[in-house]
């Protein structure tokens, strides 16, 4: 991303950022302190400091496309948190209307989450809200909003009809695994990248804080539920993900490196 010009449909950093990456030598104080304590010598360039003997690239789309990588980068595919426990009761019981999963995680904004849920309160859907951001006042929310704490999101495939999440990589990966469209809101730059890859693939929509403040959540939800092209792409991606085991492949790649280093 930082070292090459874009080829075809691949995403790459703009030219000015690639230029900066080649010369930037900034080191966070915590890195230099630890290096000093343990007698380590840090690389001159910042981008080199962020590399290792083996870099496991957990990107879904890098693996899906079969992108060629340069050592020490090795593609392994998605690795996401598999929360223990069962799915909440609202997921397991019979229902007559769509079930929407909302997961804003710890990086989300309580104000944005509250506004999203208020707009979904008037929709003819049930809403399952995962853990993370805590709301101090839920009195304005409808009885179709169900809070569940930590949800084993990797088990939601076949149970939900769409989701609305932040753009953290693990959250985006489990949203894709569910095989239904999602709408993603970025809380930081890295999250924009994760959402953008899914938008380009065709299984997701991006939305912003301004969309929320303008009351556009219902329109976004309607498209997630009605856009058959997007729903087909989401099913396709979910099926592809179920053939991947990033964690197992990561172990294999680490063991390969250790054997070769003997």
Ranges and model annotations:
Residues 1, 78-81, 151-153, 187-190, ...:
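Short, acidic/turn-prone active-site loops that include or flank metal/cofactor-
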Residues 1-71:
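Active-site-proximal region of nucleotide-activated glycan assembly enzymes
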Residues 62-162:
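Donor-nucleotide binding loops and adjacent catalytic segments primarily
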Residues 148-197:
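A donor-sugar binding/catalytic signature common to diverse glycosyltransferases
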Residues 214-262:
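C-terminal amphipathic helix plus adjacent low-complexity
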């Amino acid at each position: 991303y930082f070292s090459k010009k874009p080829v075809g449909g691949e995403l790459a950093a703009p030219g000015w950022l690639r230029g900066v990456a080649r010369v930037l030598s900034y080191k966070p104080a915590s890195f230099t302190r630890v290096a000093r304590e343990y007698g380590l010598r840090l690389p001159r360039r910042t981008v080199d400091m962020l590399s290792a003997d083996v870099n496991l690239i957990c990107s879904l789309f890098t693996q899906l496309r079969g992108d060629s990588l340069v050592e020490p980068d090795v593609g392994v595919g998605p690795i996401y948190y598999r929360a223990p426990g069962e799915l909440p009761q609202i997921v397991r019981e019979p229902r007559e209307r769509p079930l929407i999963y909302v997961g804003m995680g710890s990086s989300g904004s309580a104000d944005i989450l509250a506004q999203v849920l208020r707009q979904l309160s008037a929709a003819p859907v049930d809403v399952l809200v995962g853990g993370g951001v805590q709301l101090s006042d839920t009195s304005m929310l409808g009885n179709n909003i169900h809070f569940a704490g930590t949800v084993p999101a990797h088990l939601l495939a076949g149970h939900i009809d769409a989701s609305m999440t932040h753009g953290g990589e693990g959250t985006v990966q489990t949203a894709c695994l569910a095989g239904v469209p999602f709408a993603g809101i970025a809380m930081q730059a890295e999250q924009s990248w994760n959402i953008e890859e899914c938008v380009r693939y065709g299984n997701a929509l991006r939305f912003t804080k301004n969309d929320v403040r303008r009351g556009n959540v219902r329109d976004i939800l309607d498209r997630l539920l009605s856009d058959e092209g997007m729903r087909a792409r989401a099913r396709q991606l979910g099926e592809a993900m179920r053939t991947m085991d990033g964690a197992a492949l990561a172990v294999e790649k680490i063991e390969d490196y250790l054997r070769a280093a003997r």
